[in-house]
Amino acid sequence: MSLNKNYLDVPGTTIFDADESRKGYHLNQFCMSLMKHDNRERFKSDQRAYIDEWPMTEAQKQAVLDVDLNRAISLGGNIYFLAKLGATHGKSFQQMAGSMTGMTEMEYRDMMIGGGRSVEGNRVVGENGTAQAHHQPQGQPQGASNKRAK
């Protein structure tokens, strides 16, 4: 029995539900491994060899190598786990979040200090707000392939 996931209509947002958790399990476990110094050093010395030890999909591995956080999230990555990948590369969470929105770190900071994105035009997929896919670097609605039928 499938759940009716009304939240797939929230633009620019991936809800980390049970399905996403299952899809990204190995990706997220890889990220958790980076909490250990020895694992971070092994990863930094030969990224491909280290990620090949993990049973991730090739798309997940490529997202890690590209440090493409939007892609990693679309493949089941959880931002709190992915933060360990960013930290391994010397990035702050603010830098990571900015990169996910197509903004510089300072543009992102200023937006957040100003109260974040407006909800106007961003309540459901298909409006014309700044969180809509056509305004984002990833260019596709989150969950586009899973979007519920109206």
Predicted region positions:
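Charged, low-complexity intrinsically disordered segments
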Residues: 1-150
